[in-house]
Amino acid sequence: FQACASEKPNIILVLLDDVSPDMFSCYAPYTPKGAEHAGNTPNIDKLASEGVMFKTCYAAAMCAPTRVELVTGRYANATGVYQNGMWSKERSAYFLEDFPSIGKLLKDAGYATAIAGKWHEGAIRPYEEQGGFDEYCIWSGLSLMEKCDNFKGWSGGMENETTISRYWNPGLIKNGKVLYTKEDDFGPEICNRFLIDFMERSVKKGQPFFAYWPCVAPHGTRQGITTNPFRGKVGEMGKSNPEESAARFKSLNEYIDFLIGRMSAKLEELGVEDNTLFIITSDNGTAVTAKTRGVERGCHVVNVISGYNVKKRGATEELTDFTDIAPTLVEIAGATPPEGYQFDGVSLVPFISGDKDTHREWIYGYISTSQVIRTKEYLIEVLNPMLGLPEGRFCYTGENRFREGYIRAEGLPEHEEARQKLLKIAEQFPPVTTAHPFWDTRRGEAFYKDYTSEASRLKHLHNHKDWIYYNED
């Protein structure tokens, strides 16, 4: 099934869940704890070496805002989605009524579209018109399962009393039907197999495909880190000792790498590897040590792009953030956004294709009311008037990318011009303050009470104790 060069390229987009770059062997040489933490990820490593691996890519520092940013190409100041519990506009949950989904744009451009895994993007489902996905296999709760005409109760896997399993014996809805799984069925493997089947059918039909895999892994369960087909007992999803939990987490990343390798192998089998763009990224940094924190590590994620029309660069110092993904896919697919619609991001096509050797001067990350802005040599993190840091924490990073070697630079005259430049960029994104109407809502009141507590404030404004490499006072 050899694809012609004149055909539109296929696209695979893999979004991993709760994992920092230091967990991947291709990033290990650049990260301070890479040798200790990284699993063996040869398939991702191969894609990185044959394409582009961004040392510095920013998402948001939590699941929902990142996913919204990815499918819309817009920051939270536009969509109103700042945190899982902070959908700040009256109809933020229905953001796809105002912001086109990348799935819908590619479908309208003639692509077969499929999604498998975790949606977590508000009230509009990916299979509805605004979502744009033709086929789906989604981890779901009981309320959605009950709407399926083949629903006959659920006796499968549970993570706790209320959460249906995403891993062993998982709860999935596949194209409108509850998928009743077995005890030894593993959610990521099912989703991977679903997308590979979709890819093969699309190639046979001669239709370009967009396969979006927002994978549930390696996110923990409600009780702990799961076992997986590479490690541990089938069905075990509860707590274990710290050493075993760390080993499971590393092993789970290695298993996901194995599944990514299966996708690469299928592309080769179908003869379309050179006509398929392959992107691997993650929604936020690792839970506990990075996720939800307003520091750089919270929003610093893996980003590997390989395949169709991608120049072999390997690790790059160029910067990118999640708003770049949508305009990149739109350009590659020849899709057309609605008239007047403007992405916040910039298409990566000129850089990844080799037409240009630079991409953009600065990138932007956020979580809750904190903002993070970076250039190649400077960083402002936890810019957060609500929590007492109206100008954030300013660092000179030089050529460093993973916190080691950063120098606090407030008050140093030789760096003041750069600090003012970052603050000027921040003016484009007015921070959320106590005057925001969200805090007057019931959800906002509850969020505010927890968020501004001393314990939450200290966690949010600082790195985890094992990841402090510069003065944070």
Q: Which residues does each PLM region occupy?
A:
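Formylglycine-dependent sulfatase
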Residues: 3-392, 397-473
